[in-house]
Each structure stands twice: as C-alpha cells, then as structure tokens.
C-alpha cells in the first residue's frame, strides 16, 4: 500500500488500484472510473488495494460491491468510512470530513447527498448508475450539437480525450524520485531508471545492497573479493561502474541516500560497506549522467537508496538470524511504527565472516533510526541518523600475500528535512551531515618490515539542499533547486612506538549550485524535458551542465525516448593534495551521453521489455602520467553499447525476468564487463517461495596496465528460498556459486566456490 500511495501522488491521478501485481491508474474526478471498472472487470476489484484522493459514500459503495481488500484515502467522508468498516474492509486515511463537497465548494456533492440516507449498497447502485448515465447523456448531447456547428471536430476531440483517460496498466516500480527530485511516473521521463524494490532486496538475504544491484541492473557492476565485506584502501573491493564509467576508486558514479550525496570527504568516493539492505525501501539506479540534478560525480549515473518508511497505522517488528559458510553470521532487527501523525523506523544489525582465505575476516555492526511527523496536510518533518562500524582484513593477492593489512572504519550520516506536497506542488528543504573516522594499517609483504605507523583520517561532508516543484499549467512541471556542500577533512600518520603524529593533509572545499528542470506534456503522446545546472566549486571554478530529452507515448502501452545529457566530476582532495602523484591544478572531467530507448507493456501489463542504445564521449579524465609522476587531465572515454530488460508474470505462481548489457570500450577499464547477462525465475505458492538466477559475465577486465592485461569469464548459479513455518516465522536458505566456478573479480583474489547460508525470519 505504501508504494500505491506514492503512485497516487506522483502524477495527476485521482485513484490507483492494484490487484495481482497489476496496477490501474485513473484520472477522472468522481466515481465514473470506479463505476466503469465494476461494469467491465469486477474480478479485478476483488481483494484489490485502492488508493484514492477523495472517497465519498458512492465511491465506498462501489468498492464494497467490488469486494476490494483495503482502501487508503487522502480525504474520506464519515458515511463512506462507516460503510467500508461495516463491510470489514481495512481503511486508512489522512483526513475525515462530515461529507464530500461539490466542485464549487458551495454545498454537498450531488452523489454524496443522493446516497446519504440510503442504507444498503444494493439501494445505492441504481442511484449511481442513473446519475452517471444522466451526466454522460448531457455530455453526448453537447458534443453532437457542437459537432454540427464545427463539422465533427468536437466529436473527434472528445473521443481523443476519453481515450487519454482510459485506465493504464502500470507497475509499482514506475514511480521514481531520482530523475526529477519529486515523485514522478517514469513514463514521463526521458532518462532510464532501474528500480529494485523491497521484495527483491529481501529475497537476496544479503547484508549489502550491491550484490542485488549487480544482478538486477543492466550495465551496473560491483567488484567483490569474498563472502562478506569490501574494505577500503589496498586490495579493497566495492568498486562500482555503470556503462564503463565509475573508476577505481568509484568517483564517477554517485551514491545517494534519499537524494543526499554519500562519499568520503577527502577521497571523494563512496564507502561500499555503508550501503546496507536494512536501510532501503527500494533502490533507484539512473543509468546515465545525472549531473543536472545532482552535480559532481554523477557522470556515469546515480544510485539512490530510498529509505524505509511506514504509511499505515500499525507496528511491525522483524528479526532475522542467519549463519553459513566460513563462519558467516548475519543478523538484523527492525521496528516500524505509524501512529497518527508520527512514524518511525529503527533497525540494527551485526554481521561477520572469517572469509574463505586466512586473514580475510570482516565484522560490522551498526544502527539506523528515522522519525517523521506530519505537521499538517501536505507538510512533513523527518529526520534520520545512521552509524556503522566495521573491521576488515586484507590478505593480499594469492601470489603476493600481505600481512597485518587491517582497517577500522566508522561512518555516520544524519539528515533533517521539511517536506511539502500537494496536488500541484512538492518540495523539500533538507540539511545533511556525513562523517567518517578511518584507521588503517597498510600491512607489509613477505621479507618486509611491519609498518611503523598507522594512517588516520577524519572527514566530513555537510550541506543544504532545497527544491520546489510546481505545476504551472496543464501538463507542466517546473522544478528549481539550490545545493550547497562543504566537504574535506584531515589525515595524519601515527607512529606505533611513540604515538607521534605526522600531519598529512588538512583541506576543506565548498560547492554551490542552482538548477532548473522543465517538463511539459504535449497532448497525450509526448513529454518534453529540459534542464540546466550552474555549479561553482571553490577551487576549480564554474561548470555549466545542460540536458534535454523527449518521451513519446505510443499506442499499445509503448514508450520511445531520446536523451542528451552532460556529466562532470570535480577533482577530489586526494587527487589534488594527497599522496604522490597529487596535482592541485587539475580540472573537472566531462562527458556527453546520447541515448535512445524503447519499452512496452503487453498482456495487460504482465509482460514488459525494454531496449537501450547509448554512446558516451568524454575527455579531461584524470589519469596518472608516469613520466611526470603526477595526475593530469589527459584521459578520454568513448563507450557505446546496448542494454535489454524483460519481465513476465506468467501467473500468480511464476515470474521470470532477464537483463543483458553489451559494452564496447575504446579504452578498457577494470570492473566493467563487456557482457553481463542475468536470467531469473521466482516461484511462490502456499508456504513456499523460491527464486533462482544464473548470471553470465564475459570480458571483465581485472588488469589493464601496459605490463598486464587480464580478463575473466564465468557463470554463477544461485538459489534462494523460504518456507513459512507459521504466520510469523519463515525459514530461509540460499546457495551461491553452486557450479563452483573458479574466477576472480579483483586480480589476485580468487572468489569462493559454492557457499551456503540458512536462517530464520520472525515478523510480528
């Protein structure tokens, strides 16, 4: 129901209804859409979830007749609420009113008045039927009269208008915030956004979000080195790439949590171990540059983690305990509450693994809390905080072992946001603060002496973000925003013997940016989008970033989209001031992305497929010039490729999906496979739920230096399943790499062969 409510508010919908994973959206005011659906497909209504902006007694009567399962209403009348509760239908609402007003706000709604004294839905139905018939008779007569005067033009226009209002089948994942800042139907956006929902995340039984993204998002890849954990510094995994853009460390791909940037203030890259499954309601991955809305680092795309929330008045508590191969333990506790205007989410986790190699242990613990309060209709105050600490060990490459390479990392984040949302406007003013404390022993190789000092750092990033989106006129949406970021930190080396500190770098920088995005629907067949951002960096200066695109809404639930966008990345403090080959004169990296995509839904929304073609051309990339022994802006990127996705819900029991990406890189980089294919199937019946998937990776570069160039090819087969022991307890198990493939993702770090994990989920 939470996603259904989000969909209701994402566009100009009056009502949305979900049944058997298929969603109908409606735009007509009043009860005409509900009446038509009850006439044409009453079976769809049975047991359905409904989210409606206004529910009066007549609408409630149609819902009772259709035997819907649950209802949410922004506004509901007292008679409607009583009727639904009398029929034992679960109801949640934002505001209860004595009666529904007419459109002029001068008195009762005619149907509300006509049904007010009627006791049964059997009495109300003929009243509703006759009322709608009378309204339509008047419209038909007016249309015929006008057609006689204008030669039939009015009749054609009326027919087109009615066609545009026909309920369309959509899926819940089509409502996104990443491409526009505000909630939007993805069909109106020219960019491509992949959505991984909570159900997909939970079926993985993984503490980290990155493995499920690697499976489900074409063109996205994450490096790995073992059962659990990614680490930092020497030998670290967790490098992310999208369409061959990202880097190692990942500076060309931006990670967000609820739209706020997440990266280490000194190094400028995300910390992979901080992005845990317990945080996410869903993850939205924008494939392609998103610098207009999010600025630096969003060159290759954006991974936006949308945190969990509670929409309905209920208390949910969950406990997950699991154990598996190589001393692996994963635990999680969560509690979600909604009571009146107050809501909260609190989660905690502890995870550990010995690893499949000696000296490869990993341990992590942390917690997350989010509080929200509805100040008034359309206004909400929300704040959250997340702290995680982990200890990671790196054994080095198998042919060159490393000893005592241990890291102790603590990361934290907090934010406070004031949000507003109405039918025509939405926006937010938010403050965010991220910080980190790193302690690293770089270790030593065989024959070397142990390190005499330890690397230490403190970093922070804080900022203010404001945006406001408004509908100025029909089919229009204008979004304007301002971002401010302050980031940096300090580093030092601390002697083991004496405790003496040798200063490293102590730098702080600022960014200011303003942006505007304009979207206009032209009729029912075209959406036009254009945006621009002006970004000022306190060291490198000003960058101008444009983007534009078209989305054609074609017959038979198909969409054709074209997009041109610019991405950029400012140099990091590490690249300019830390460690040789630093260079303070570096300039921003830049690229242009050209993209064409087509998608279609068929068989009543049960079948979906989409294809993307793209070309990326960039220059000024920061690379190390060995002859000069410093970083310079001499690198280039020229990538092109294709991506495809497909999903088919065969019946309520079986669901299959697949995605494929092909990438050609003129200048190959590590951690970006040339081909990646995933094929999966989900089975759900009775107490059983089982999912399986096969992933094929080819042309994965693990080394691209002049002295050494290596690639990997492998096939992974994974199976996961759960059994509902009783209403509150589920047993789960998973097996990964069941073909026992021998392969490497990080050069010199062989991955484990077949591994197994099992455990229990308790919900109450």
Task: Give the ranges of each region predicted by the language model.
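Short strand-turn segments of transmembrane beta-barrel domains in outer membranes
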Residues: 302, 307-336, 348, 353-360
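Extracytoplasmic beta-strand/coil segments of soluble accessory domains associated
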Residues: 214-260
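Structural signature of Gram-negative outer-membrane beta-barrels, strongest in the C-terminal barrel
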Residues: 376, 473-477, 502-617, 651-652, ...
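Short acidic/polar hinge/loop motifs at secondary-structure boundaries
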Residues: 260-287
């Amino acid at each position: 129901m939470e996603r259904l409510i989000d969909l209701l508010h994402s566009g100009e919908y009056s009502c949305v209804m979900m049944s058997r994973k298929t969603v109908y959206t409606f735009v007509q005011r009043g009860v005409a859409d509900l009446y038509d659906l009850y006439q044409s497909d009453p079976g769809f209504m049975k047991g359905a979830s409904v989210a409606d902006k206004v529910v009066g007694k007549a609408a409630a009567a149609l819902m009772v007749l259709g035997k819907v399962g649950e209802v949410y209403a922004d506004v509901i009348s007292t008679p409607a609420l009583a009727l639904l509760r009398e029929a034992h239908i679960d109801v949640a609402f934002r505001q209860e009113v004595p009666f529904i007003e007419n459109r002029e706000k001068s008195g009762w709604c005619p149907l509300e008045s006509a049904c007010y004294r009627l006791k049964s839905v059997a009495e109300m139905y003929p009243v509703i039927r006759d009322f709608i018939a009378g309204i339509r008779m008047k419209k038909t007569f007016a249309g015929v009269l006008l057609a006689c005067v204008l030669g039939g033009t009015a009749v054609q226009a009326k027919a087109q208008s009615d066609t545009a209002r026909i309920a369309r089948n959509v899926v819940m994942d089509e409502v996104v915030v990443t491409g526009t800042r505000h909630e939007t139907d993805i069909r109106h956006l020219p960019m491509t956004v992949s959505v991984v929902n909570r159900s997909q995340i939970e079926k993985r039984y993984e503490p980290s979000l990155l493995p499920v993204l690697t499976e489900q998002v074409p063109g996205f890849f994450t490096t790995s080195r073992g059962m659990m954990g990614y680490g930092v510094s020497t030998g670290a995994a967790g490098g992310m790439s999208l369409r061959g853009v990202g880097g190692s460390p990942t500076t060309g791909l931006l990670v967000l949590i609820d739209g706020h940037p997440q990266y280490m203030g000194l190094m400028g890259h995300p910390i992979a171990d901080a992005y845990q499954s317990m945080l996410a309601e869903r993850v939205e991955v924008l494939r392609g540059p998103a610098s207009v809305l999010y600025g630096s680092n969003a060159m290759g795309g954006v991974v936006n983690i949308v945190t969990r929330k509670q929409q309905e008045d209920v208390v949910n508590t969950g406990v997950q305990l699991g154990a598996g191969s190589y001393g692996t333990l994963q635990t999680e506790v969560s509690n979600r509450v909604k009571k009146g205007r107050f809501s909260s989410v609190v989660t905690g986790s502890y995870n550990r693994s010995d690893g499949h190699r000696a000296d490869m242990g990993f341990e992590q613990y942390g917690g997350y809390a989010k509080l929200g309060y509805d100040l008034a209709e359309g206004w909400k105050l929300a704040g959250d905080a997340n702290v995680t600490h982990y200890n990671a060990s790196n054994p080095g490459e198998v042919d060159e072992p490393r000893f005592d390479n241990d890291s102790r990392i603590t990361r934290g984040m907090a934010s406070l946001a004031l949000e507003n949302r109405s039918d025509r406007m939405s926006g937010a003013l938010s403050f965010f603060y991220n910080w980190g404390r790193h302690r690293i022993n770089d270790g030593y190789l065989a024959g070397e002496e142990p390190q005499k000092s330890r690397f230490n750092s403190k970093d922070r990033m804080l900022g203010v973000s404001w945006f406001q989106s408004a509908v100025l006129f029909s089919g229009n949406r204008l979004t304007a925003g301002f971002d401010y970021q302050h980031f940096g930190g300090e580093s030092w080396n601390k002697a083991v013997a004496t405790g003496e500190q040798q200063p490293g770098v102590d730098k702080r920088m600022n960014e200011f940016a303003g942006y505007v995005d304009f979207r206009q629907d032209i009729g029912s067949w075209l959406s036009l989008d254009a945006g621009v951002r002006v970004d000022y960096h306190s060291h490198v200066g000003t960058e101008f970033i444009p983007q534009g695109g078209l989305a054609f809404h074609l017959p038979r639930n198909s969409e054709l989209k074209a997009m041109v966008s610019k991405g950029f990345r400012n140099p990091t403090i590490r690249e300019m001031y830390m460690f040789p080959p630093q260079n303070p004169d570096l300039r921003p990296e830049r690229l242009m992305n050209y993209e064409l995509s087509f998608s279609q839904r068929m068989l009543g929304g049960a079948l979906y497929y989409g294809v993307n073609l793209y070309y990326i051309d960039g220059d000024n990339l920061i690379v190390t010039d060995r002859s000069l022994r410093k970083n310079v802006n001499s690198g280039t990127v020229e990538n092109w490729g294709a991506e495809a996705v497909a999903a088919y819900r065969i019946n309520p029991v079986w669901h299959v999906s697949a995605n494929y990406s092909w990438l050609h890189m003129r200048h190959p980089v590590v951690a970006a496979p040339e081909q990646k294919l995933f094929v999966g199937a989900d089975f759900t019946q009775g107490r059983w739920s089982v999912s399986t998937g096969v992933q094929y990776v080819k042309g994965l570069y693990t080394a691209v230096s002049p002295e050494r160039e290596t690639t990997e090819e492998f096939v992974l087969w994974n199976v996961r399943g759960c059994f509902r022991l009783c209403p509150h307890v589920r047993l789960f198990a998973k097996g990964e790499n069941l073909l026992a493939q021998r392969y490497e993702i990080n050069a010199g770090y062989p991955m484990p062969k077949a591994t197994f994990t099992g455990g229990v989920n308790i919900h109450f």
